[in-house]
A protein has these predicted regions:
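GNAT-family acyltransferases
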Residues: 1-107, 114, 132, 166-185
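Charged catalytic carboxylate motif
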Residues: 10, 14, 125, 151
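Amphipathic alpha-helical recognition patches that constitute DNA-binding helices
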Residues: 107, 140, 151
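Conserved acetyl-CoA-binding loop-helix of GNAT-fold acetyltransferases
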Residues: 109-112, 118-135, 153-158
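Glycine-/small-residue-rich active-site loops that bind phosphorylated ligands and cofactors
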Residues: 117-118, 148
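Conserved GNAT acetyl-CoA-binding A-motif
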Residues: 133-144
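Conserved beta-strand-loop-alpha-helix junction that forms the acyl-donor binding cleft
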Residues: 143-153
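Conserved acetyl-CoA-binding loop of GNAT-fold acetyltransferases
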Residues: 157-167
């Protein structure tokens, strides 16, 4: 059964195994993101885990794929789990508003390891995070995907997502086409 787990040091070996097997939590940056995270974990595993939940947006600015830096917003990471690590899901928001800054493409993002795809883990993970998003005061969550990512589109629509726009991603994300969906809460 698919679960969302708060990252802990005890669960970290499953995450590290996925990174060493070629999975990356960031499809835009790719393998460099995995290498960076492995180095961070090796240097300070407990600190890495602690930073996966950042409800107060504390810390250094976030570096975007193009190298530009932006302020953090509140968020938390979950690890998708079903008899081991399956992927990660992130939830981001700003207090008091559903609006997101232009550099944040959606409230929810997820990535499932290749060897556990097509089992419904992403669909269930998104479903499981929606009550937490509602508890943050959000009336809806926005999720974006590439137009050709049919699997992600199915995940979003299975959770009630409605297409609200086709758009061009900001320069920091390559000025590529994207689709923005909204899931009402």
């Amino acid at each position: 059964m698919t679960e969302l787990r708060t990252p802990t040091v005890d669960l970290l070996p499953g995450y590290v195994d996925a990174l060493t097997r070629g999975w990356t939590p960031d499809h835009i940056v790719g393998p460099a993101a995995a290498a960076e995270q492995l180095a961070t974990i090796e240097a300070d595993a407990a600190g890495f885990v602690a930073r996966q939940t950042n409800l107060s947006a504390i810390g250094d600015p976030v570096t975007l794929p193009d190298g530009s830096k932006v302020q953090r917003i509140p968020g938390r990471q979950y690890w998708i789990w079903d008899d081991g690590f399956c992927g990660r899901l992130s939830l981001r928001w700003q207090a008091g508003t559903a609006a997101l800054p232009p550099h944040v493409l959606g409230h929810v993002g997820y990535a499932v390891v290749a060897w556990k795809r097509r089992r419904g883990h992403a669909t269930q993970a998104v479903r499981l995070v929606l009550p937490y998003a509602r508890a943050q005061g959000l009336p809806y969550v926005e999720v974006t995907t590439d137009p050709d990512n049919l699997a992600s589109r199915k995940v979003i629509t299975a959770n009630g997502g409605v297409l609200i726009e086709a758009f061009t991603k900001p320069a920091a994300f390559g000025n590529t086409p994207g689709l923005r969906f909204r899931i009402p809460l």
